[in-house]
Amino acid sequence: MKLSLIFILAYLIGSFPSGVIIGRVFCHKDPRDAGSHNIGTTNSYRVLGPIAGTAVLFLDILKGTLAASLPMIFHTSNHSLVLVVGLAAVIGHAYSIFLRFTGGKAVATSAGILLAYNPLFFVIASTIFISVILITSMVSMASIIGPLLIAILSFYTHDWLLGTIATLVLIFLTYRHRENISRIKNGTENLVPFGLYYRYKQKKRQ
């Protein structure tokens, strides 16, 4: 019974719509009304501005970390359950009960789970994420390559549970980014205003 309640609580934590709350309360905007209409960090940066976007990023990471830490907080099981419970927060973020089962793509929330489970891998994942953005100028590309490399690294270090969960997250994030992947193939994906590929595109237009 306690474990079931923990999963429900993790889902509810993940369901907290950080982007919508910050947008409405502090910016008097709803990120769902502009840009990509997504409630996550990237669109929050675009619609609400860098300060609000950064706040959304940290809150979404915190959601994953807090939800994944519930088994330890309630002393219910071993450290491995952190990853499994964390998945409930990912589902909550993507299909929030507070937003009629719509939501974001759960990249930051997934990273928060990794922070709770293995802080070193979180740092590695963050470094990969930033590096890919600086090269490709695409958040969507970084959102897929990051978990892919973490899954490979996990299997290489014989952390089979993390490797399995990272693979599941990779599949889920790939599905959530299916429209972005189509735009990448067509050469029409949105770029952040920095990075090597962005500079290349700017020079090409001149």
From Swiss-Prot:
Any one of the GO BP annotations: phospholipid biosynthetic process
Subcellular location: Cell membrane
SMART domains: G3P_acyltransf
Transmembrane segments: 3-23, 47-67, 79-99, 119-139, 152-172
Enzyme Commission no: 2.3.1.275
Keywords, in A-Z order: Cell membrane, Lipid biosynthesis, Lipid metabolism, Membrane, Phospholipid biosynthesis, Phospholipid metabolism, Transferase, Transmembrane, Transmembrane helix
Record InterPro entries: G3P_acylTferase_PlsY (IPR003811)
Gene Ontology CC entries for this record: plasma membrane
HAMAP family: PlsY
Protein's recorded name: Glycerol-3-phosphate acyltransferase
Species name: Latilactobacillus sakei subsp. sakei (strain 23K)
Gene: plsY
